[in-house]
């Protein structure tokens, strides 16, 4: 909920005040994957369009806009690209670019990095564009 989001932002800001730095250089994370997972969508055919989790990526973008890290890493399942016929992923990319980040998107396989799983993941790395 919006109240929980605001409370979390407030706690992070208070913790930052206690540190020597007032800035966050890197944010790493992503919303829960159930709404974007192809398996999850197959299980919840009738309710998936109304699932509030489809829009949790918007909170990630809000975090980026509030804390303005130099770099961020966003992770999720490959199904995020096709969920909602691609509209959520398109909106995610546009929203990130609109707040001043250039992004690179890759699909990675966990086992290529020593993880004992063959899971594929979409990774978005964003870099804050410096204003001239």
Show the residue positions of the predicted features.
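N-terminal Rossmann-like NAD(P) cofactor-binding module of classical short-chain dehydrogenase/reductase
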Residues: 26-28, 73
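Short glycine-/small-residue-rich Rossmann-like dinucleotide-binding loops
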Residues: 32
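S-adenosyl-L-methionine
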Residues: 1-21
């Amino acid at each position: 909920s919006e109240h929980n989001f605001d409370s979390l932002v407030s706690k992070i800001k208070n913790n930052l005040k206690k540190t020597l730095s007032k800035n966050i250089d890197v944010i790493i994370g992503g919303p829960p994957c159930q709404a974007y997972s192809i398996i999850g969508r197959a299980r919840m055919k009738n309710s998936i369009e109304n699932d509030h989790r489809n829009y949790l990526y918007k909170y990630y973008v809000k975090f980026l806009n509030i804390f303005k890290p130099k770099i961020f890493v966003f992770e999720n399942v490959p199904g995020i690209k096709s969920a909602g016929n691609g509209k959520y992923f398109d909106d995610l990319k546009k929203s990130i670019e609109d707040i001043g980040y250039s992004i690179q998107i890759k699909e990675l396989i966990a086992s290529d990095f020593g993880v004992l799983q063959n899971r594929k993941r979409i990774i978005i790395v964003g870099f804050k564009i410096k204003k001239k």
